[in-house]
Amino acid sequence: NNVGGPPVWCDVNEFGVPYYEDIVRRVTADTKAIILVNQMGVPCDLDSFNSLNIPIIEDSACGFGSEYKGKKIGNSKFINTYSFQARKCLTTGEGGMIITRDKDQAEWLRSYRAFGTSVSPLERDKAQFLLKEQFDKISSNYKMADIPCALGMAQLKSFDEEVKLRTKAGEYYNKKIKELSKDYDIQIGNLIPDYCTRYNWQNFHLVLGEIYNRDMVVDILRRNNVGCKWDIQAIHKEPAYNHDVDLPQTMKFHNQGLWLPFFAEITREEQDYVIEMLKNVLNELR
C-alpha cells in the first residue's frame, strides 16, 4: 500500500507457507511481484514459483539458518529480507537485513537505509578528503547500530550449535505431541516438506481441534506459568486491512493454532511440565 501496490491475499498450505496453486489462481496481468513468506522457518518451494516468471521478494524473517534443497534460505536470485528480533534464532535485539545479488538494488538500498544519502557513513568516515554527501531521495534512518550488529556477528560462530539444540528440543516436543494426539484432538503444526533439507526450528506450534477453544487453552496455560501464545495471525483480518477473503488454511492456524514455549536451552523438565499442563487443560475442556 505504501508504494501504490494493493496486496492480493493468498492462502497457505499445510506447512504454513504460501500455497502455490492458490497464488496461481490469483495472478493477473497486473501482478507486479509475489512476496513469499518463509513462515516459522519453513522455506517456500522456490522452483515452483520460479516458473511463473514474476519478480519475487522472500520474507525470511523466521528463516535464517533453514535450507531449501541443500542451499541456505537467501541463496537465490531474489531480494531476501531477514529479521533479527529478540525471539529469532539469531538475534540483535531488533533490526534485520536485506540481501540481493543485484548491484543497482544494493546501492539503492544502502542509500535508502541512511536517509537517502549518496554516500554511506562508512565511505564518508574512511575518506582521506572532505566527502560531501547529497540526498537523492526522501527516506529515513533504517541503519543497524554497530553494537547490535556485533552481537549478531558473534552469534554466527555458535549458530550451528543453536540449531542443533533447537532441533533436539523440537523433536522431543514432536514425540510428546504425537503421543497426546492418540487421545486428544490435536496435531503437530511443524510439518516439514521434503525439500527443506535443514530446518532451523524457529518455534514450535500445534493446532487444536475445533472442539477446543484455543483462547481458553492459552489463558489457562498462562495462568499455570506456561508462556504460550496464539499462533500465526491472519493479516487480512487485521484492522489495518480487514479484507473479506476466503483463506481456510490460514484461518485454521489463526483460530486453532498456538505456540508452546520454545528456545534452544529449554530443558526436558521444562518441556515435560508444558506437556503435562497441556494434557490437564485438554482434559478439563473436552
Please state what every model-predicted region is.
Residues N1-G63, E67:
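PLP-dependent aminotransferase-like
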